[in-house]
Design a protein with these regions (language model features):
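Plant-biased detector of terminal regions, especially N-terminal secretory signal peptides
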Residues: 8, 24-25, 107, 144-146
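Beta-strand/loop substructures that line and gate deep hydrophobic ligand-binding cavities in soluble
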Residues: 81-134
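A generic beta-sheet turn/junction motif
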Residues: 10, 57, 100-102
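A short, structured loop/turn motif at beta-sheet edges
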Residues: 14-15, 68-73, 96-106
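Hydrophobic ligand-binding cavity/cleft-lining segments
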Residues: 1-44
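Hydrophobic/aromatic beta-strand elements that line small-molecule binding cavities or substrate pockets
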Residues: 6-8, 62-68, 91-98
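Short acidic/polar mixed-charge low-complexity motifs
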Residues: 2, 58-60, 88, 103
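Glycine-rich portal/gate segments that line the openings of hydrophobic small-molecule binding cavities
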Residues: 29, 38-86, 134, 138-146
Length: 146
């Protein structure tokens, strides 16, 4: 099972960054590849089990289900239900932790999924460098100290 791991330090308190990522429907604000997003069935965006449907600026649509959300741990876990990527059993977690020597936080985003073995390396790279890292870069731009 391939694993993606990307981490970063953001020059903002974890609480401030969490306000951006906590909203399961807020991807267009901080994930550059996302054009628009909506929560199906008008469910609250923090309701476990809610499904977000979103489109990518480059084309393609995804549906993801919220599996866990913790204001205590600053973490969100979700699964891909439908995607143009050739993956299955995809589960990802984005987690924030305060850095104790200043108003910064450590952010990590992980994912595990199944795919054809010949595609694993390419997909890990594509997700890590093409999705997760640009998301962290945009969060730094939006909420980091200037």
């Amino acid at each position: 099972m391939p694993k993606v791991y990307v981490s970063s330090v953001i020059d903002a308190p974890a609480e401030r960054v969490w306000r951006e990522v906590r909203d399961f429907n807020a991807l267009p604000r901080w994930l550059p590849a996302v054009a628009d997003s909506r929560i199906e069935g008008d469910a609250p965006p923090d309701q476990i089990g809610c499904v977000r449907a979103f489109t990518l600026k480059a084309g393609g649509a995804l549906r993801e289900k919220l599996l866990a959300l913790s204001d205590f741990d600053y973490s969100v876990c979700y699964a891909i239900l439908e995607s143009p990527m050739p993956v299955s059993n995809y589960v990802a977690t984005l987690r924030l932790a305060p850095v104790t020597d200043g108003e910064r936080c450590f952010a990590e985003w992980t994912a595990e999924f199944d795919c054809e073995p010949s595609r694993a390396e390419e997909l890990v790279e594509r997700i890590g460098r093409g999705v997760f890292q640009p998301g962290f870069d945009e969060l730094k731009r939006r909420v980091g100290r200037r």
